[in-house]
Amino acid sequence: MAGNKPFNKPQTEPRERDYQLDGLKVPPHSIEAEQSVLGGLMLDNERWDDVAERVVSEDFYTRPHRHIFTEMARLQESGSPIDLITLAESLERQGQLDSVGGFAYLAELSKNTPSAANISAYADIVRERAVVREMISVANEIAEAGFDPQGRTSEDLLDLAESRVFKIAES
């Protein structure tokens, strides 16, 4: 039977999951939405309350964006305007201007923001991605607890899982 190729039997069992590759996955985020929230706030300070109702600094994926948002919150709380100059000056005083990308990066944030009018939608995207990242984190914690129950029963583990997921739902 020359020329006959071996026949590949259809796979009937699910492929084994490669847990080593799980560590290579990039958590969900939207750098563009984060940039547009920050840039939009520099363009329109009046939208602060809309944004602050939706996101907190921990919702931002990148450390520089978390620092920028935190500094914006400080400016807002002190009654100072949030714009390129005041934000850069405040970050410089905190010793963080270079670590967030410098003056040029802050300028790009406001310059590249599509529209400050859509800032609530951008903030919703940032929050949505943060919730999904938290779900992933909790799922990993639950899996770790299952692999190493430390004497806990399955009921204890279910209670743990339920409380952790419920905490996300409440936030």
Language-model features: locations:
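Noncatalytic partner-interaction/assembly domains of nucleic-acid and motor enzyme complexes
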Residues: 1-131
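Extended, charged alpha-helical coiled-coil/arm scaffolds that mediate oligomerization and mechanical coupling
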Residues: 103-171
